[in-house]
Amino acid sequence: DVYKTYLVTVQLAYPSGSELSAVEGVPVKLTGSTGTTYDATTDANGKAAFTVPAGIYEASASEKRASNGYSFILNGVKSGITVTETWTGDSVVEVALTESKSGQVIIKELYVGGCQKDDGSGNYQYDKYVILYNNSEQAATLENFCLGMVNPYNANSTINDYKDGVLSYANDNYIPAGCGIWYLPRNLTIEAGKQVVIALNGAINHTLTYSNSVNLSTADYCTYDIEDFSQTNYYPTPSESIPTANYFTAYKYGQGTAWVLSNQSPAFFIFSTHDVTPEVFASNTDYHYTADKEGNAVYRCTKVPTDWILDAVEVFSQAQLAKSQKRLTPAIDAGYTVLTNAQGYTSYRNVDKQATEAVEGNSGKLVYSYNYGTDGSTDPSGIDAEASLKNGARIIYQDTNNSTNDFHQRKQASLRD
């Protein structure tokens, strides 16, 4: 006998207040309890129709769209859809979409773990850097551009913002930036498909002393403000090749002689204060707070609105994985990448294989058989991004606002390639 089937209509519901609305062609998936999947796409009203046998289903949808210079990612899941012989097909299953917004500029690489010293006496960690990349097709010009990190510095430390297992700011539309922020006193412009290197510690050639380290004397930008952060281990005088106009300036509202980005498990983010200058924003005590540590400046943070945040990455230490907790909210980063520090390893973004292979002119320029992954972590695309870039290819990196999916541990800092 031919088994009976039923019409299931799924309606995608866009967030209230979003500048986006329903469009035709968004992929929607129905997954049965046995693992069987059914695929359909939406019509212009955001509806997708399925014909399925009786069963229990989960509907899911994911959409990525660009608008007004920003990238939008929308995700939604509806579980427990029970289709039985009483199902008439008149009911519409609504899947509420959550929206996250990211800018054109992404964090391509975050190197914080340090390396082993040549004499075997331990590790060296004052060579941190970040590479920002314009993942879009248009030049990006960012005003009032800033760098931030979340307290506590290590993911396995006590997080005072957790209440009954939930971040106290989970639904408050901000991320707390600890200690202080770094900001560029002028606009940051990155051409499409290009990158900038920012030395977060020591804009010098570290390899002259530690051969396993990196050369940051040729960085494009650096963090250097000796009045606020005076510890010379972190901030030696930058290389003369870096113009002083490319120094990031600090605004410190916490305490300390250095902006101590964790060498094990940082939560790092980039943002723009838009029409407010960084100094005015960071000095506004209405944004300041100390989670359960009132009056203690060591714990003072400032609340960065989530819609100001362009990109972020959360890192967990491999050695402290079981004790680590999220500090970034799901709308900013729904996952984490894992790092074994002190080995010269780096957190490197995965390639969007489909998008990269679809770029006109990339044929014959992409280098495959990627072999820089380590400790069971690698780029699933199989594309060697650095080798491909040197070969003239245009790389599109994966950006789903989930570091578990978007990053891997690379066994060598890309600046050493």
Give the residues covered by each predicted segment.
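Short strand-edge motifs at loop-to-beta-strand transitions and within beta-strands
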Residues: 48-50, 91-93, 196
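Short, ordered, surface-exposed loop/turn motifs in non-cytosolic proteins
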Residues: 16-34, 140-144
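Solvent-exposed beta-edge/loop recognition patches
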Residues: 169-405
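Bacterial Sec-dependent N-terminal signal peptides
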Residues: 1-18, 95-97
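Structured interaction patches on ligand/partner-binding surfaces of diverse proteins
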Residues: 65-96
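Short Pro-Gly-centered beta-turn/loop motif in secreted/extracellular proteins
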Residues: 49-58
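Short, acidic Ser/Thr/Gly-rich low-complexity loop/linker segments typical of extracellular
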Residues: 34-47
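A structural motif detector for short, solvent-exposed N-terminal "entry" segments of globular domains
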Residues: 97-156, 243, 252-266, 271-295
